[in-house]
């Protein structure tokens, strides 16, 4: 039996979570319901290759193509984290043909809250 094609509204939100070990891209509708997602690990990269900006770009490209197939055309981008794949993921979303209206950096920054963990030697 053929799979039913899902359609969504033309605008949505892309959440980019860039950690030091992986990059996760989730595309949602305006209400926050997930449309599609992808990550460096889900594509097939393992270990140190997941950290690279290239893998974040490939993951963003995969998520964007799936979302565009469902009818998405414009997005707002919320970036979270300090990983290396943030900028590449944004560029990949734009290169796929999605129109970007806003970019927000929502990385939590403490106003001298908890003591950070000690640095590795």
UniProtKB/Swiss-Prot annotation:
One of its GO terms (cellular component) is ribonucleoprotein complex. It comes from the Bacteria. The keyword Zinc does not apply. InterPro entries: Ribosomal_uS11, Ribosomal_uS11_bac-type, Ribosomal_uS11_CS, Ribosomal_uS11_sf. The keyword Ion transport does not apply. GO terms for biological process: translation. GO terms for molecular function: rRNA binding; structural constituent of ribosome. Keywords: Ribonucleoprotein, Ribosomal protein, RNA-binding, rRNA-binding. PANTHER family: 40S RIBOSOMAL PROTEIN S14/30S RIBOSOMAL PROTEIN S11. NCBIfam families: PRK05309.1, uS11_bact. Part of the 30S ribosomal subunit. Interacts with proteins S7 and S18. Binds to IF-3. Belongs to the universal ribosomal protein uS11 family. Located on the platform of the 30S subunit, it bridges several disparate RNA helices of the 16S rRNA. Forms part of the Shine-Dalgarno cleft in the 70S ribosome. This is Small ribosomal subunit protein uS11. The gene is rpsK.
């Amino acid at each position: 039996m053929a799979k039913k094609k899902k359609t969504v509204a033309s605008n949505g939100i892309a959440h980019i979570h860039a950690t030091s070990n992986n990059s996760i891209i989730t595309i949602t509708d305006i209400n926050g319901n997930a449309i599609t997602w992808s990550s460096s690990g889900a594509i097939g990269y393992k270990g140190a290759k997941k950290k690279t900006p290239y893998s974040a770009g490939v993951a963003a490209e995969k998520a964007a193509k799936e979302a565009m197939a469902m009818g998405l055309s414009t997005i707002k981008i919320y970036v979270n984290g300090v990983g290396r794949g943030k900028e590449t993921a944004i560029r990949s979303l734009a290169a796929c043909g999605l129109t970007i209206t806003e970019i927000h950096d929502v990385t939590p920054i403490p106003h001298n809250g908890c003591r950070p963990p000690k640095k590795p030697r």
